[in-house]
A protein has these predicted regions:
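Predominantly a core beta-strand signature of beta-propeller blades
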Residues: 22-25, 61-65, 111-115, 163-166, ...
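Conserved beta-propeller blade repeats
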Residues: 1-6, 26-47, 53, 70-93, ...
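C-terminal closing repeat unit and adjoining cap/tail of repeat-based domains
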Residues: 153-155, 162-166, 446-489
Length: 501
C-alpha cells in the first residue's frame, strides 16, 4: 500500500505499508500527492520543497523531475492516465482574487502540456470504468457549499478532450471528496466533507500564560470569522455569510445572537473598531459568480451609533482563498489593523513582489505614507500589528518554517525568533501587553495554540486534534482570546450504481 503525507511525528513523505506485516517504510522525504502507475512500476508525486512534479521507481529509486510549474503557478494532484502513458495534474493560479484552476496532462516521455478543462470551482476527480474522467464542481453562490459530479471523455493518446463535459448529478448537501469506483466498477464511493468555521472565545488567565476551555460564540451553521474587539473588550465584531454573502455583525460575549452592523449585496470582511471607538472599519468587494469580479475593493467605515457606511479608500487585490473555498478565506492580503495607541492609527498590509508593503491610513482621511516593506512570500505569510502600533510580526505557513520576524515600522533589520518545534503557522497575534505572541500551529494532527514570550521559549496553551485555526484575536484588556477554527466532518458514502442526473 502506498501513502503520502505526514505519519505520526514524521513530516511529509512517501511510505510503503505492508498489508501483511503492517510494517511502515519511508521511500521519499519532502514529498506528497503520490500516485502509483497502473502497472505498479512507477510513482508520480509532488516535491514539497520545489513544488515540482517528480517521477520515481516504485521502490523509491531513480527519482527525476517531470514538470516544473510556471512562475506564480502551482501544480497539484498528479495522477496517471488509465493507460499509464500520460500524467494528469491540476494547475492553479490566483492573482488578486481571480482564480484560475484547470486540468492539464503531459506525455510520460515529455512534450507539450495539453489542457483538458478549466473551472475555478473544480474540487476533486477520479477515473470512470470506461476511462472517462469524473470530477466534482462547487455550485455557484449562494449554493457554494454544495458540489456536483461531471464527466468528460478524451483521447488517451493525445490527452485532448472529446466533446463537452456532461453533468451527472444535481444534488444538494454534498461536497464530493476522494470519489472513486470499486474494483469491479459496480459501486461509486466518496467522502461527503463539510467544513465549517465558527467563532470561539477562551479566557486567558495567569497573565496570559494559561487558556481556559474555549466557548462557541456563533451558533449558526454558516461560515463565521472573528474580526476585532470593542475597546472595552465586551463585544466581538465578526463577519458571516449567514445571509448568503459576508456581512458585518457584532455580538456581546454574553449574548446568543449577533446584531447586523453592515449588510448588503457586496462581500464585507474583517471588521475592526477605530482607535476613537466611533467607527467600524471593514474591507468590501463587489460580489461575482465565480469569485471577485474585480481585483480591487474599498475600506469602508460604518458608524457604531448607526447609519450608512462610507468609503475610506481604495485597496488593490483580494485576500486569497484555498481553491476558491470561502470556508478558508480568512487570510491573505490586503488586510489591516487598527490600534488605540498606534502613531498612525491604522496600518494596511498589501502584497508586493515577494514582499509585504505596510502603509499608514486614517479612518477619516484615507491613505497616508508607506511605512515599511518586509521581504517574505506573501502567499504563505500572516501578520499582526503590535498594541502600540510601532512593530509588526510576520509568520510563515510552511511545514518546515518555525521562525517569525518582528520588524519596526520605523525601519531597521527585522528580529528573528524561533518557535521550534511549532511549524505551519496559520495565525499570529500580539498579546495585549506587547510582551508575547500567540501562534496557531496547524498539522495533520490538528491545531496547537502556543504562547511565545519575546524573551523566552514557546509554551503550549491549547491543542485540538480536529480543528484548523487560521485567526487569533486577543481582546484589548488581555482577558480573552478569540479564534476561528475550521471544523470538518466527513462521512463515507457508497452508491450501488453510478450516479446519473
Amino acid at each position: 500500500m502506498l501513502v503520502s503525507g505526514p505519519v505520526a511525528q514524521e513530516k511529509q513523505g512517501i511510505w510503503l505499508i505492508s498489508v501483511i506485516g503492517a510494517t511502515l517504510k519511508k521511500i521519499r522525504d519532502d514529498a506528497y500527492d503520490a500516485s502509483l502507475s497502473p502497472d505498479g512500476s512507477q510513482i508520480v508525486f509532488r516535491d514539497s520543497i520545489t513544488r515540482d512534479i517528480w517521477l520515481m521507481n516504485a521502490d523509491g529509486g531513480q527519482a527525476r523531475s517531470f514538470l516544473k510549474p510556471e512562475e506564480s503557478y502551482n501544480l497539484y494532484s498528479p495522477t496517471w492516465f488509465p493507460n499509464g502513458k500520460r500524467i494528469l495534474y491540476a494547475k492553479y493560479h490566483e492573482n488578486n482574487g481571480e482564480v484560475s484552476l484547470g486540468l492539464e496532462s503531459r506525455d510520460l516521455k515529455g512534450g507539450d502540456m495539453v489542457p483538458l478543462l478549466s473551472n475555478p470551482r473544480l474540487t476533486d476527480l477520479c477515473w470512470g470504468q470506461s476511462g472517462q474522467l469524473i470530477y466534482s464542481v462547487r455550485e455557484r453562490p449562494p449554493n457554494q457549499y454544495d458540489s456536483n459530479l461531471w464527466e468528460i471523455r478524451f483521447d488517451e493518446g493525445t490527452g485532448k478532450p472529446r466533446g463537452n463535459p456532461r453533468r451527472l448529478t444535481d444534488w444538494t448537501g454534498f461536497i464530493f471528496v476522494d470519489p472513486g469506483l470499486t474494483a469491479d466498477g459496480n459501486r461509486f464511493v466518496f467522502l461527503n466533507v463539510r467544513p465549517q468555521s465558527d467563532v470561539y472565545v477562551a479566557a486567558l488567565t495567569n497573565g496570559g500564560s494559561e487558556l481556559k476551555a474555549p466557548q462557541r460564540v456563533t451558533l449558526d451553521e454558516r461560515t463565521d470569522w472573528p474580526g476585532g474587539w470593542s475597546l472595552d473588550s465586551k463585544t466581538m465584531f465578526l463577519y458571516s455569510d449567514r445571509n448568503g454573502n459576508f456581512d458585518i455583525y457584532k455580538q456581546g460575549l454574553n449574548e446568543r445572537n449577533a446584531e447586523p452592523v453592515a449588510t448588503g449585496s457586496d462581500e464585507k470582511w474583517a471588521p475592526q473598531i477605530t482607535p476613537d471607538g466611533k467607527w467600524v472599519l471593514y474591507m468590501q468587494w463587489s460580489k461575482a459568480i465565480d469569485g471577485p469580479a474585480v481585483n480591487s475593493g474599498k475600506i469602508m467605515r460604518s458608524p457604531l451609533a448607526g447609519g450608512p457606511s462610507e468609503a475610506v479608500m481604495d485597496i488593490k487585490g483580494h485576500p486569497e482563498t484555498l481553491f476558491g473555498d470561502p470556508t478558508y478565506s480568512v487570510g491573505g492580503f490586503p488586510s489591516f489593523r487598527c490600534r488605540l495607541h498606534a502613531p498612525s492609527g491604522c496600518v494596511l498590509a498589501e502584497k508586493g513582489d515577494k514582499q509585504i508593503v505596510f502603509t499608514a491610513f486614517d479612518p477619516l482621511q484615507g491613505r497616508k505614507a508607506e511605512l515599511a516593506k518586509i521581504s517574505v512570500d506573501p502567499d504563505s505569510a500572516n501578520w499582526d500589528l503590535s498594541p502600540d502600533g510601532t512593530r509588526v510580526v510576520v509568520s510563515i505557513f510552511d511545514y518546515k518554517a518555525a521562525d517569525i520576524q518582528i520588524a519596526s515600522l520605523a525601519g531597521g533589520t527585522p528580529q528573528k525568533l524561533s518557535v521550534m518545534p511549532w511549524t505551519e503557522l496559520g495565525a499570529v497575534a500580539w498579546a495585549a501587553d506587547g510582551k508575547s505572541l500567540f501562534l496557531a500551529s496547524i498539522s495533520s494532527r490538528g491545531t496547537s495554540i502556543v504562547r511565545m514570550p519575546l524573551t523566552g521559549g514557546p509554551k503550549l496553551l491549547f491543542k485540538q486534534p480536529s480543528w484548523d485555526i487560521f485567526s487569533l484575536m486577543p481582546s484589548p484588556d488581555g482577558r480573552y482570546l478569540a479564534f476561528g477554527p475550521v471544523i470538518t466532518t466527513a462521512n463515507a458514502w457508497t452508491i450501488a450504481s453510478f450516479p446519473r442526473k
